[in-house]
A protein has these predicted regions:
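Active-site core of glycosidic bond-cleaving carbohydrate-active enzymes
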Residues: 122, 371-669
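Extracellular/oxidizing-compartment recognition motifs
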Residues: 1-366, 375, 391-396, 411-415, ...
C-alpha cells in the first residue's frame, strides 16, 4: 500500500543489549478473540531510557546533510547539544515510520556529535505500539549522495529515570528523576564517553520501515502568565491547557526533592488539582544533585497549572513548557464573526484541535493519547478548516488502513498495541475518505484506499437480514453515543462489548450512509458497480420511519424516537419529505454527547435549518459550548460539562464541530 515510501537501508537496527536476543511479543488481536492470551512482559524491561552517541565528521564544502532516523518506541535527537527533533509517529512494526530530516544547520565543519535518547515504555496502550520487546534505533546520514556514518554507536542506559506507577489507562509512567545518576553533558561533543559500550546490532529485526508522510512536531517555548510564591514553593499558571513537558532549573543540595504536580484546574488559590477528572494523577519527583540542575522530563502531559513544592531551600527558576503540536498555521483561515460568544467557542475548539493534533489526531493528550477512528471525523475536518493541511488526515486514513491486518472491519484505535473495536466508527471510514477527497482533491489516495473501504463494506454485509438491514453486529461494540447517559434514552440494549439481539437504527443509518459514500467514491473513480444505496434507503425508511410522528424510531420493535435515531438519518439524507426531524431537534436540543453534535448540526444543514444549527451552537443550556466556557474551559471538553461524565477530559478535539459547521454555513450564505 505504501511501497513507494520504503527504502533499502545500508545500516542496521541497533538496541540496548537487554533486548538483543528477545523475540517480539504478539500484541495484535481481535478485541474479543477468546484464544488470545496477553503475553507476560518482564517488569525489569519496562520504562527503559537508552542513550546513544556517535561522532560525525563534516568535510569543508559540504552543502546539504540529510538524516534518516527511526526508533522504537520513540527518540529525541540532539546534535552538538542542541535539540533537533523527535519521533517517529506511532506505527505498527510491519509499516514502521522513519523520519527524514535536513540537519545541515545543526552541523559544523569537522567533528560533530549525534546524541539520541531512545525510550522504550513496555506498556500495552493506545499511545505507543509498545509492550512487544521491539526496542532500539536505526540511523543513516547522507551528504551529496555519500553515506557519512556506519551503525557503530556507543550506548549507555540512562539511570536517572524511575517511576512509582502508571498514569490513566497505563498510558505512561510517572517520572522520578534523580539528577545524581544523570550522565551530565552527554549530548555535548566534549563529553567523555570512553566508558560507554558499543551498541549491538539486533539481528533479525522485523521492522519494515516506511518514510513518515507528515512533518515532525513543532515546539513552542511557553512561560507562565502568572507565578505565585506559596509557602513551600510556587504555583504556576500558563493561562490555558498546553500539551508538552514542563521544564525548569534549580540550584540546591544533593538529595533535595522537588515535587511537581500538574493539573487542568485548581483546588484552591494555592493548590493544583493534580488528580485530573480524566483519571490522570500528575505527580512527579525531581531529586537534585549538588549545584545547578536542569529538569528534563521525557513524556508529555496536558495541563494548565504546575505546583512546585519542596522542604528544601533550593532556588527554583526558568519555568517553562515545551509546548508540542503538529505544525499549525491558521493564518489563512478567514472565518470571522462579530458574535463574541462565537469567538469564544471558536477559540476553545481551535485550542483543543491544536493540542490533540500531535503525530496523529489524538482523542485527548492525557488519558488515552490514542487516535480514534470516530473522533477523526470531527478533528481532521476542523484541522483542515483551520489550517488547510490534509497531510495528517491522509496519514490517519492509512494508519487505520494498516489496522485491517488485525480485522478487515477495521480497528477503532490505530496505531497502538491496545485493541479496541467499535462498529459505528468503522462505518464512518467511507465518509472520511470522501471528506478527505473534498478537502484535498487527491484522487490517487482515494483509489489506493478503496479496497480498504470495500473490505469494511463486505465485513458488515455479512450481518444483513432478509430486507438488507443489518442486525446482531456482535463482533464490535455498537456505540451509538458516549457517554451512555447522553444517548437520549435510546431504546436498544447496548452492553459493551456485545450488543443485544435485534435490528436497531443508528448502526443501520451508518451502514446505509456508508453505502451512499461508497457509491460516490466509485463514481469519482469511474468504477462500475451494482447500485444498492437507493434501495437500502427505502428499506431503512420502511424499517424505522413512523408516518404518524414523522420521525425515525430507535429499533424495528420500538416506538421511541431518540435524537440519535433522527440525527444520523438527517446527516446522510435518509429522511422522507414532510418529516418532523427539525422540530424534534428544536425540542430536544443537544441531548447527546459532544461527538454526536457534529452529525446533529450537519443534519440540520441538510434539512435547510441553518438558523437552528446556529442556535444550537450558541445555546446556553447545560448541553452547550457556552457551558464549557462558563466552567472555565480554555480547550473544548469531552462532555458538555465537567460533571457530565465520570472521567471528563477537559481537552478533547471531538468537541470541535462548530469550526467546520460555521465555515460551511458561511460558504452557504
Amino acid at each position: 500500500m505504501e511501497e513507494n515510501r520504503k527504502k533499502i537501508w545500508k545500516n542496521h537496527w541497533i538496541c540496548n543489549p537487554k533486548f538483543e536476543d528477545l523475540k517480539p511479543l504478539p500484541t495484535l488481536h481481535k478485541q474479543q478473540d477468546p484464544t488470545f492470551r496477553k503475553p507476560e512482559h518482564r517488569k525489569d524491561l519496562k520504562n527503559i531510557h537508552t542513550l546513544f552517541r556517535k561522532k560525525l565528521k563534516i568535510e569543508a564544502g559540504t552543502k546539504r546533510v540529510r538524516m534518516d532516523i527511526s526508533a522504537d518506541d520513540y527518540y529525541k535527537l540532539y546534535i552538538n547539544g542542541q535539540y533537533v527533533t523527535q519521533g517517529p509517529a506511532n506505527s505498527y512494526a510491519f509499516c514502521y515510520y522513519y523520519n527524514q530530516i535536513d540537519i545541515t544547520d545543526y552541523l559544523q565543519e569537522g567533528e560533530n556529535i549525534l546524541a539520541v535518547h531512545v525510550y522504550y515504555q513496555g506498556l500495552v496502550n493506545r499511545a505507543y505500539n509498545s509492550g512487544d520487546y521491539r526496542q532500539g534505533m536505526i540511523a543513516e546520514v547522507w551528504a551529496d549522495g555519500v553515506s557519512l556514518i556506519d551503525d557503530v554507536w556507543k550506548y549507555k542506559e540512562a539511570e536517572e529515570y524511575g517511576a512509582s506507577g502508571t498514569i490513566a489507562y497505563e498510558t505512561q509512567f510517572d517520572e522520578i528523576i534523580d539528577e545524581r545518576k544523570k550522565a551530565v553533558g552527554w549530548k555535548m561533543p566534549e563529553y567523555d564517553d570512553s566508558g560507554w559500550k558499543t551498541a549491538p546490532i539486533r539481528e533479525n529485526d522485523d521492522h519494515e520501515l516506511i518514510l513518515q508522510p507528515t512533518k515532525n512536531l513543532e515546539m513552542e517555548h511557553r512561560v507562565p502568565l502568572h507565578i505565585k510564591k506559596i509557602e513551600d514553593g510556587y504555583l504556576l499558571d500558563f493561562g490555558e491547557d498546553l500539551t508538552g513537558t514542563f521544564a525548569m532549573k534549580a540550584n540546591g543540595k544533593s538529595g533535595d526533592i522537588i515535587t511537581i504536580r500538574c493539573g487542568e484546574e485548581l483546588l484552591s488559590e494555592v493548590q493544583v488539582r493534580n488528580e485530573l477528572r480524566c483519571n490522570c494523577l500528575y505527580e512527579d519527583k525531581w531529586i537534585l544533585k549538588e549545584g545547578e540542575n536542569e529538569l528534563e522530563e521525557f513524556e508529555y502531559k496536558c495541563f494548565r497549572y504546575v505546583q512546585l513544592t519542596t522542604e528544601s531551600s533550593a532556588e527554583l527558576w526558568d519555568f517553562h513548557v515545551d509546548y508540542r503540536h503538529y505544525p499549525f498555521d491558521d493564518s489563512s483561515c478567514t472565518y470571522h464573526s462579530e458574535d463574541a460568544l462565537i469567538g469564544q467557542i471558536w477559540e476553545i475548539c481551535k485550542n483543543a484541535v491544536r493540542n490533540c493534533s500531535q503525530e496523529a489526531f489524538l482523542d485527548c493528550p492525557h488519558r488515552e493519547k490514542g487516535q480514534y477512528l470516530g473522533d477523526l471525523t470531527v478533528t481532521a475536518h476542523a484541522f483542515y478548516c483551520l489550517t488547510g493541511d490534509t497531510d495528517l488526515f491522509r496519514k490517519a486514513l492509512f494508519d487505520f488502513a494498516h489496522s485491517t491486518v488485525v480485522c478487515e472491519g477495521m480497528m477503532a484505535v490505530a496505531p497502538g498495541s491496545f485493541m479496541q473495536e467499535i462498529a459505528d466508527f468503522s462505518l464512518l471510514y467511507a465518509y472520511q475518505l470522501l471528506l478527505y477527497y473534498r478537502c484535498s482533491k487527491d484522487l490517487e489516495t482515494l483509489r489506493k484506499l478503496l479496497p480498504v473501504a470495500e473490505g469494511i463494506e463486505w465485513y458488515f454485509d455479512r450481518f444483513q437480514r432478509f430486507d438488507g438491514m443489518i442486525e446482531n453486529v456482535k463482533t464490535k461494540w455498537n456505540l451509538v453515543d458516549w457517554p451512555e447517559n447522553l444517548r437520549d434514552d435510546y431504546d436498544f440494549d447496548l452492553p459493551q462489548p456485545v450488543v443485544g439481539d435485534g435490528c436497531h437504527n443508528v448502526i443501520n443509518a451508518l451502514y446505509v450512509g456508508m453505502k451512499k459514500c461508497m457509491e460516490e467514491i466509485r463514481d469519482l473513480l469511474q468504477i462500475e458497480y451494482q447500485p444498492q444505496y437507493a434501495a437500502l434507503r427505502k428499506t431503512f425508511i420502511r424499517a424505522f420511519y413512523c408516518e404518524e410522528t414523522g420521525l425515525f424510531v430507535d429499533s424495528v420493535v420500538s416506538s421511541h424516537s431518540s435524537l440519535h435515531a433522527n440525527a444520523f438519518a438527517a446527516f446522510y439524507g435518509l429522511y422522507p419529505e414532510n418529516n418532523q426531524i427539525a422540530d424534534l431537534i428544536r425540542k430536544k436540543g443537544l441531548c447527546c454527547g459532544v461527538f454526536v453534535s457534529y452529525f446533529v448540526l450537519y443534519g440540520l444543514l441538510n434539512l435547510g435549518e441553518k438558523e437552528l444549527a446556529y442556535e444550537l451552537i450558541t445555546n446556553k443550556s447545560e448541553h452547550s459550548w457556552y457551558n464549557m466556557i462558563r466552567e472555565g474551559a480554555t480547550t473544548a471538553f469531552e462532555a458538555w460539562g465537567k460533571d457530565q461524565k465520570w472521567n471528563t477530559s477537559l481537552c478533547h478535539a471531538w468537541a470541535s464541530a462548530p469550526i467546520p459547521v460555521l465555515m460551511e454555513m458561511e460558504q452557504q450564505n
